[in-house]
Amino acid sequence: MTDFTPDAVLDATGLNCPEPVMMLHQHVRNLAAGGLLKVIATDPSTRRDIPKFCNFLGHELLQQQEDAGTFLYWIRKKAD
């Protein structure tokens, strides 16, 4: 478990590829530079897609974890 306090939460529970990453892209756009976003997902492909999204766009994936089929991600938006 983590002590991160997110500025926003994206609940993509029940959504399948490509919806979680599409929603993530919109949520990151609305987040202030340096803001922290928590993503909750159930699609196993997010284990691959979200780290690639962060790497490609320069955002920091602070932590990811899995708990009983639920995937959690904490993403810090890059500075502008």
Curated annotation (Swiss-Prot):
InterPro entries: Sulphur_carrier_TusA (IPR022931), TusA-like (IPR001455), TusA-like_sf (IPR036868). Gene3D superfamilies: TusA-like domain. Keywords: Cytoplasm. The keyword tRNA-binding does not apply. The keyword Transmembrane helix does not apply. One of its GO terms (molecular function) is sulfur carrier activity. It is found in: Cytoplasm. It comes from the Bacteria. CDD domains: SirA (cd03423). Its main location: cytoplasm. The active site is at C17. Transmembrane segments: none annotated. PROSITE patterns: UPF0033. GO terms for biological process: tRNA wobble position uridine thiolation. GO terms for cellular component: cytoplasm. Belongs to the sulfur carrier protein TusA family. Sulfur carrier protein which probably makes part of a sulfur-relay system. This is Sulfur carrier protein TusA. It comes from Pseudomonas putida (strain GB-1).
